[in-house]
Regions:
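Acidic/histidine-rich
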Residues: 155-189, 464-490, 525, 532
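Active-site phosphate/pyrophosphate-binding segments
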Residues: 153, 262-266, 270-298, 388-517, ...
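Generic C-terminus detector
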Residues: 229, 544, 570-611
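Glycine-rich oxoanion-binding loops at beta->alpha junctions
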Residues: 67, 71-84, 275-289, 312-348, ...
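Conserved short alpha-helical segments that host acidic/polar catalytic motifs at enzyme active sites
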Residues: 1-248, 252-253, 264-298, 334, ...
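Glycine-rich phosphate-binding loops that contact phosphosugars or nucleotide phosphates
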Residues: 292-441, 521-526, 530-565, 586
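Glycine-rich, anion-gripping cofactor-binding loops and their flanking helix/strand elements
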Residues: 182-208, 330-365, 505-537, 571-584, ...
Length: 611
């Protein structure tokens, strides 16, 4: 959601803050601002809309001299998007500037008390309460650290905070609770940020803050304190990401670039994990006995990661002969789940910071379940709190609509199923071998799909003018349809829903009329005849069908459907890995035809870190 960047060192802060904020644009925002301490004291500039408005207002930061500052891109939660509600929020005295990601749940109560003490408020935000509260405590103590500590004791809710005080222009203070925040270590300069991509051009050495921690950041060092305000030493993580991976590299959009990066991303995800035809997951600490003794398996995730989990349910049940449940993290945490010792909860998250997934993890852990996470960001909160973690190694994913993270999550989940199935003795050698060989072939097969996109672009032009598109599919094709539908609505703003084909007669078919676009996923050949029957069924009501199938089904599908998207043959459980690529491209080209902001679709954020 909101993006935070802070800098203290010897360089001019504002241009660096703008650069960092640009690298956080993908998180979603509606306004931006910066605060810098310089020769003229504490200066703040804010602007509604795109970050370029702030850059123009400050002459790319040159109009705000100073070597220490904080910046923020805001996603409105309290108060409408405007200059006044943008961050940084400043205390009435002008002494404190605060940037904040999260929600202060008791802000109304605190605001009432501050009003009674004579404070006035300019904004509608909960964050202004933090700034005013700091000022109140500072009046008594004249000690910034003590004021921050008192403020943190008073507020309830979630927060990642960057704090700048005009009286101490050589240091920043950072604090975290249930919202991501990290510290970057440089040479004669140090940083704070909500996401490592903001810092990659300046440092690869970072420390991820844990809940309840507070950090004092100066040019000469960083001091970290735990919840009881005792100094702590923390392990630094080296982020081995290619800086250029966070650039477009000649592509029109990050999303298109990341679609085309999927073959390489899959290759990285499986490197070292398949050896001499066997799956080897040396990352795991689970013993063979612990694996054999697994009871229930529950996959917990949000958004596209949830769709990965749906594919995982089908595949893990086939490979492990265990019941697998897949739950939305936002529902799991409130559902009083039947989970406990001996059960395995698999948490899937690209960022490793998704708030609902984090809360679900903690709920499952509290009940005694073992936690295994599949995440992309090394050292992220979910990774740190899991018993085991499998990294996807997808590298930075900038577009809001996920592509390569989805694909790498799925391949890692399939590897996990093979690894467990081998140890449990629940998967036959023929299936195991076919799956391993199929996974190794995925990068080449994806490249084959990506080598010819002209017919997908043509199909996109036919669909771009419609206001709604339906997806249908059975079994794995239903899970695939859900992801295809989500991609389309995310970036093209076309109303789209995915339905299990067998449910058409239970109400959905009433929505089909003359010319209604229906995308029929029919890659799973054991159910191909049923898929064809559903195609005929919707065509009889006037639907204009676009089909997705394998090379084996193309000729038969063409007998009924003009436009057919084709993927290569592979093991049945791997078909969603290939089928998603043409659906990603279709969504991209439709959004392009409609002139949409593909990388930063309206009202969406890359990482959802508030409820």
């Amino acid at each position: 959601m909101c993006g935070i960047v802070g800098y203290v060192g010897t360089q001019q802060a504002a241009p660096l803050l703008l650069e960092g904020l640009r690298r956080l644009e993908y998180r979603g925002y509606d306004s931006a601002g910066m605060a810098v301490c310089g020769p003229d004291g504490l200066r703040v500039q804010k602007a509604k809309g795109r970050l370029q408005a702030l850059a123009d207002l400050t002459d790319e930061g040159k109009a705000m001299p100073g070597v220490i500052g904080i910046g923020h891109t805001r996603w409105a939660t309290h108060g409408e998007p405007n200059d006044t509600n943008a961050h940084p929020q400043v205390s009435e005295s002008g002494r404190f500037a605060v940037v904040h990601n999260g929600i202060i749940e008791n802000y109304a109560e605190l605001k009432k008390k501050l009003l009674e003490k004579g404070y006035t408020f300019r904004s509608e935000t909960d964050t202004e309460v933090v700034a005013q509260l700091l000022d109140w405590y500072y009046r008594d103590s004249r000690d910034v650290f003590e004021a921050v500590t008192s403020m943190l004791s008073a507020v309830e809710g979630t927060y990642a905070l960057g704090i700048l005080c005009a009286d101490t222009p050589d240091r920043l203070i950072a604090a975290r609770k249930d919202a991501p925040l990290l510290l970057g270590y440089g040479e004669g300069e140090n940083f704070i940020a909500s996401d490592v991509t903001a810092l990659l051009r300046h440092t690869r050495n970072v420390v991820y803050m844990d809940d309840g921690e507070l950090a004092v950041v100066s040019a000469v060092g960083i001091r970290i304190y735990d919840e009881r305000r005792r100094p702590v030493e923390k392990e630094r993580h080296y982020i081995d990401w290619d800086v250029d991976a966070a650039e477009k590299g000649g592509y029109a959009h990050f999303m298109l670039k990341e679609i085309f990066e999927q073959p390489t991303a899959i290759s990285k995800a499986i490197t070292g994990r398949i050896q001499e035809g066997r799956v080897v997951l040396s990352d795991l600490t689970m013993t063979d006995r612990e694996i054999r003794d697994i009871g229930r398996i529950c996959i917990v995730a949000c958004g596209s990661s949830y769709h990965v989990g749906m594919v995982g349910k089908y595949n893990l049940e086939r490979m492990l002969r265990r019941s697998v449940e897949v739950c939305l993290a936002s529902e799991f945490r409130y559902s009083d789940p039947i989970i406990g010792p001996g059960d395995l909860v698999i948490v899937i998250s690209q960022s490793g910071e998704t708030l609902d997934s984090m809360a679900a993890l903690r709920e499952a852990k509290k009940r005694g379940a073992r936690i295994l996470s599949i995440v992309n960001v090394v050292g992220s909160s979910i990774a740190r709190e899991s018993d085991d973690v499998l990294y996807t190694w997808a590298g930075p994913e900038i577009a809001v609509a996920t592509t390569k993270a989805y694909s790498t999550q799925m391949v890692v989940l399939n590897l996990l199923g093979l690894y467990f199935g081998d140890i449990m003795g629940t998967i036959d050698l023929e299936t195991y071998t076919a799956m391993v060989q199929g996974i190794q072939a995925l990068p080449h097969q994806m490249e084959e799909i990506l080598s010819d996109t002209g017919y997908i672009q043509a199909a996109a032009r036919e669909l771009a003018g419609h206001d709604q598109v339906f997806f249908i599919g059975r079994n794995l094709d239903y899970a695939l349809s859900l992801e295809g539908s989500l991609k389309l609505k995310e970036i093209s703003y076309i109303h789209s829903e995915a339905y299990a084909s067998g449910e058409l007669k239970h109400g959905t078919i009433s929505l089909i009329e003359e010319g209604t676009p229906v995308i029929a996923a029919a890659t799973y050949m054991p159910l191909f005849d049923k898929a064809m029957s559903n195609v005929v069924e919707v065509q009889a009501r006037g639907a204009n069908v676009l089909a997705l199938t394998t090379a084996a089904g193309t000729e038969r599908m063409h007998s009924r459907v003009k436009n057919v998207l084709t993927v290569p043959e592979t093991e049945a459980m791997l078909l969603p890995q290939l089928g998603v690529v043409p659906l990603q491209l279709l969504a991209y080209y439709i959004a392009l035809e409609r002139g949409c902001d593909i990388d930063k679709p309206r009202n969406l954020a890359k990482s959802v870190t508030v409820e």
